[in-house]
UniProtKB/Swiss-Prot annotation:
Keywords: Antiport, Cell inner membrane, Cell membrane, Ion transport, Membrane, Sodium, Sodium transport, Transmembrane, Transmembrane helix, Transport. PANTHER family: NA(+)_H(+) ANTIPORTER NHAB, TRANSPORTER ARSB-RELATED. It catalyses: 2 Na(+)(in) + 3 H(+)(out) = 2 Na(+)(out) + 3 H(+)(in). GO terms for molecular function: sodium:proton antiporter activity. This is Na(+)/H(+) antiporter NhaB. InterPro entries: Na+/H+_antiporter_NhaB. Na(+)/H(+) antiporter that extrudes sodium in exchange for external protons. Belongs to the NhaB Na(+)/H(+) (TC 2.A.34) antiporter family. The lineage of its organism: Bacteria, Pseudomonadati, Pseudomonadota, Gammaproteobacteria, Pasteurellales. One of its GO terms (cellular component) is plasma membrane.
Length: 514
């Protein structure tokens, strides 16, 4: 092996050779285009390359390739470190949210696992169970991070799948076996296992869409919501009320879609939990409930009280979102007996890589601002009539968010809209409506692919996906009815309900104009 071969083997680790080569080519081309052709073209090239790294997240986590591209952009002068720092400081609350809120909810997983386990065992109707999962995921995602909600549901599904797989392969529940190996599955159990996989697939997708339905409603539902709220100066309640004319109709239609795809067994939905599996899981749940000690029950009670504090703290904006998250960590660890540094450290593993990636986003946003990359698009949209502007912002955001990361897209568009407001191009009232269009545009159509929703990408890359045969293509196919309904209802609500509803809410004194 030559030195170059050894270097390339280390470079970006286990990523495919063609992917490594593509990143190297990007790094070579960008300075050439910037210095000898056009900084504007080089800027757009960087944005396209960055979107490519997000779309290829399954090949390599975008932090490394995206980070290399961003560092090079700063070195060659597309932007500068001071501007990047300014963007980071302007969005510091989002960073606090990701670091502390996600970690805080980690210590409440026991309560969330308990709730979802009871739902799965107690509700026998598949339609009712699907709606319950979708609704519960939506409600939780309005107050918690969507990644955490999906992580909990994955834990429940993994646990149940593992239990039944062991039974179907003739093992005891305490045996350590590879649940991805189907070779020992008893012949007559194969069909039941396939039905169970289809059942779990549909539940995971309903819950995933539920996180999008709930996440769009509140400041803390998705990271980009907080970025938009910061620019528009909206607190928790005002953000909820501003979004409600769009999010409430979308939420109702989302639950209706859940009912219809289950009722008529469309797009891979409709498979019921086999009776044989339910009996095994029900027996296990009963055994676990009987084994629960007084100490365990007190832990659940404390976590429920902490959840109430979380909701009240957010609703009345008692502190910055990230600081409420920090208080959750302190309360949850203090009252459930978690005092070991290494155990506490595990809570931060989930959020810190994405936090680092978000800082890279802000570097690319700084390039977009310095090179005025979005100016032609923004001028085109803002030259349209006011009502048309809302639809165009929604559609452009939706299209980009379905192939890229919605935090990145929302950050870019809200910055451009704020600049237009500052320069007197749009009126404050129009900026408020555009902020709603940007938020709903990035959150709703982005369920189309795993690239757009971080929770979907997390599900796709989790260990449950290969077990239940949930591939990228199947996720896109199963998300399709939701994509169509959420996108169209969102657009209609933006166009026909939002302007009048905003004026009505303002007349009641429920929202305050800028």
């Amino acid at each position: 092996m030559t030195n170059i071969q050894a270097f390339m083997k280390n470079f970006l680790g286990a990523s495919p050779e063609w992917y490594k080569l593509a990143i190297v080519v990007f790094l070579i081309i960008n300075p050439i285009v910037f210095f000898f052709i056009s900084p504007f073209i080089a800027g757009w090239l960087l944005v396209a390359e960055f979107i490519f790294t997000l779309a290829m997240a399954l090949k390599c986590y975008p932090l490394q390739p995206g980070g290399l591209l961003a560092i090079e952009a700063i070195i060659i002068g597309m932007t500068n470190a001071k501007h990047v720092k300014a963007e980071i400081m302007a969005n510091f609350e989002v960073i606090l949210l990701l670091i502390f809120m996600v970690a805080g909810i980690f210590f409440m997983k026991q309560l969330l696992l308990y709730v979802f386990t009871k739902l799965l065992v107690k509700i026998r109707s598949k339609i009712a169970l699907s709606i319950a999962f979708c609704f519960s995921a939506a409600f939780l995602s309005a107050f918690l991070d969507a990644l955490t909600v999906v992580a909990v549901i994955i834990s429940v599904a993994m646990g149940f799948y593992g239990v039944y797989h062991k039974v179907a392969s003739g093992n005891n529940l305490i045996d350590a076996v590879d649940i991805s190996d189907d070779r020992k599955i008893i012949e007559q159990q194969h069909e039941i296992l396939e039905k169970f996989r289809a059942f779990l697939r549909s539940l995971m997708m309903h819950a995933g869409v539920g996180t999008a339905l709930g996440g769009v409603m509140t400041v803390v539902g998705e990271p980009q919501n907080l970025i938009i709220a910061e620019q528009a100066k909206w607190n928790f309640m005002e953000f909820f009320l501003r979004m409600a004319p769009v999010t409430i109709p979308v939420f109702i239609c989302g639950l209706l879609t859940c009912f219809l795809v289950e009722k008529f067994k469309l797009f891979g939905y409709g498979e019921k939990l086999p009776d044989e599996v339910w009996k095994v899981l029900s027996d296990l749940d009963r055994t676990n409930s009987e084994k629960m000690s007084k100490q365990d029950k007190i832990k659940l009670g404390m976590q429920a009280l902490i959840a109430i504090w979380l909701i009240l703290g957010l609703a009345f904006h008692l502190a910055a979102v990230g600081l409420i998250g920090l208080s959750i960590i302190i309360f949850a660890t203090s009252f459930t007996g978690v005092t070991d540094e290494h155990t506490i450290g595990k809570a931060f593993q989930e959020s810190l890589p994405f936090t680092a990636l978000l800082v890279v986003f802000f570097s690319v946003v700084a390039v977009i601002i310095d090179q005025k990359l979005f100016s032609p698009i923004i001028h085109f949209v803002l030259s349209a009539e006011e009502n048309t502007q809302l639809a165009l912002f929604y559609l452009f955001n939706g299209l980009l968010s379905s192939i890229s990361d919605n935090v990145f897209v929302a950050t870019v568009y809200i910055n451009e809209a704020k600049a237009a407001l500052t320069n007197g191009v749009i009126a404050p009232h129009q900026f408020e409506l555009l902020s709603v269009a940007i938020n709903t545009g990035t959150n709703l159509p982005s369920v189309a692919t795993p690239n757009g929703q971080a929770a979907f990408l997390f599900l796709l890359t989790s260990s449950i996906s290969p077990l239940i045969r949930l591939s990228y293509g199947r996720m896109v196919y199963m998300a399709l009815p939701y994509t169509i309904v959420l996108s169209i209802i969102g657009l209609l609500a933006i166009e026909f309900i939002l302007p009048a509803a905003t004026i009505w809410l303002a007349s009641l004194g429920l929202i305050l104009p800028i």
